[in-house]
Swiss-Prot record:
Keyword annotations of the record: Ribonucleoprotein, Ribosomal protein, RNA-binding, rRNA-binding
HAMAP family noted in UniProt: Ribosomal_uS15_B
Top-level division of the source organism's lineage: Bacteria
GO molecular function: rRNA binding; structural constituent of ribosome
Protein's UniProt name: Small ribosomal subunit protein uS15
Biological function: One of the primary rRNA binding proteins, it binds directly to 16S rRNA where it helps nucleate assembly of the platform of the 30S subunit by binding and bridging several RNA helices of the 16S rRNA.
Pfam families attached to this UniProt entry: Ribosomal_S15
Gene source species: Streptococcus gordonii (strain Challis / ATCC 35105 / BCRC 15272 / CH1 / DL1 / V288)
GO CC entries: cytosolic small ribosomal subunit
Key word Ribonucleoprotein present: yes
Entry annotated with the keyword RNA-binding: yes
Amino acid sequence: MAISKEKKNEIIAQYARHEGDTGSVEVQVAVLTWEINHLNDHIKQHKKDHATYRGLMKKIGRRRNLLAYLRKNDVNRYRELINSLGLRR
């Protein structure tokens, strides 16, 4: 199941840097993190769902690249985001 519009708007409201912000790195990483967590739960139940596993790996790679970009350009924002999302970095 894809992320609902209400849930996505809730995540955007929490991580947006300013009014109307939907594309900042923080928002993108937060949405990807929610999707990754959701797919992890699905994979635990359906171990042979290889198509979903591939999609999960693509999302993890996308999040990794966005976090590397943020770390390179603004370490303080990177650390705040990692702490607020509870990621292991």
